[in-house]
């Protein structure tokens, strides 16, 4: 229904201006004319305002209908280009992505475990092989059992426990012998030093005493096989040669420096960085045989060495 706005129509009635009427009267009684003006005013009432309103017009109703077609997806039956998701659960894409990520993490974890196991096994095999070669060189039965089954530690605990104490003592003695005897930090007698004089001969003699003490300790160690010693035949020869040289120490260098002809003593003094052994052994024996003559020709350092060793009295 359409409604219209009704505007009232106003009709204006036109009117004329009022007329002015003038009347003149004359009188003869006074012989004087008198005029009186009578004004007559005619007035009209105001026009009436009439309003007329049109009646409301009847609205016409019209009805229209719109036809909408329903959209239906194509059927998946027999269509290879459309995925049939009717029989699949919700969130299939998320499940597939999570499965792929989980498979990647599981493969990384398996690879790490396998690599750690293989590296540990390789390390244990090498360590047991080296131990069997170094510590059990003479024991063929023990080394064969270790090499055949390197992870069977329980069978070898009894053998290793018996020899472990002796091997630890042997290694400690080797480390003590390997220490430099001429290092003042390692020498315990330097703490009680009363003078600033340093005598190489005194240090050699003190090292000889300590070495003999360690050697007596080493002889008490029970070793059933000489092959347990770590070292070769050349190292044993050098050790014996060093013992012989320490048993007869040479005197300090005199002003007449002569080259030594013995190659073994030369190598020994080069290793220890000392100036001993530059004079032949015969001069040392001659000095010990005739102390009075040697006293006239020996250097002041040699005289102080003799005083410290008790061979000379001031």
From Swiss-Prot:
Localization, UniProt: Vacuole membrane
Signal sequence residues: none
Membrane-spanning segments: 93-113
GO cellular component, one term: fungal-type vacuole
Modified residues (Phosphoserine): 148, 254, 274
Basic and acidic residues composition bias: residue spans: 254-269
Keywords on record: Membrane, Phosphoprotein, Transmembrane, Transmembrane helix, Vacuole
Recorded topology in the membrane: Single-pass membrane protein
Disordered: region residues: 32-59, 240-309
Transmembrane in keyword set: yes
Protein family per UniProt: Belongs to the PRM5 family.
Protein's name in the database: Vacuolar membrane protein FOSTERSO_4058
């Amino acid at each position: 229904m359409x409604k219209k706005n009704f505007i009232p129509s106003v009709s204006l009635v036109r009117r004329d201006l009022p007329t002015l009427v003038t009347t003149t009267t004359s009188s003869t009684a006074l012989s004087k004319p008198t005029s009186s003006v009578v004004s007559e005013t005619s007035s009209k009432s105001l026009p009436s305002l009439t309003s007329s309103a049109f009646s409301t017009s009847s609205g016409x109703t019209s009805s229209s209908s719109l036809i909408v077609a329903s959209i239906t997806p194509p059927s998946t039956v027999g269509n290879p280009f459309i995925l049939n998701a009717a029989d699949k659960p919700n969130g299939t894409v998320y499940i597939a992505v999570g499965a792929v990520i989980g498979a990647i993490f599981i493969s990384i974890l398996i690879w790490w475990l396998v690599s750690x196991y293989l590296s540990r096994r390789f390390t244990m095999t090498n360590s047991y092989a080296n131990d069997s070669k170094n510590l059990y060189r003479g024991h063929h039965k023990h080394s064969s059992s270790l090499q055949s089954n390197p992870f069977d530690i329980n069978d070898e605990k009894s053998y290793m426990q018996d020899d472990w104490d002796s091997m630890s003592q042997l290694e400690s003695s080797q480390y003590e012998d390997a220490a430099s005897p001429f290092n003042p930090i390692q020498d315990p007698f330097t703490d009680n030093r009363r003078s600033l004089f340093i005598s190489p001969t005194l240090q050699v003699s003190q090292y000889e005493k300590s070495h003999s003490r360690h050697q007596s300790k080493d002889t008490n160690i029970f070793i059933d096989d000489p092959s347990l010693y770590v070292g070769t035949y050349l190292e044993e020869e050098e050790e014996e040669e060093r013992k012989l040289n320490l048993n007869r120490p040479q005197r300090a260098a005199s002003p007449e420096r002569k080259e030594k002809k013995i190659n073994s003593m030369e190598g020994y003094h080069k290793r220890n960085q000392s100036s001993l052994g530059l004079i032949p052994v015969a001069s040392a024996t001659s000095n010990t045989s005739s102390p009075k003559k040697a006293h006239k020709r020996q250097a002041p350092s040699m005289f102080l060495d003799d005083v410290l060793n008790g061979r000379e009295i001031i």
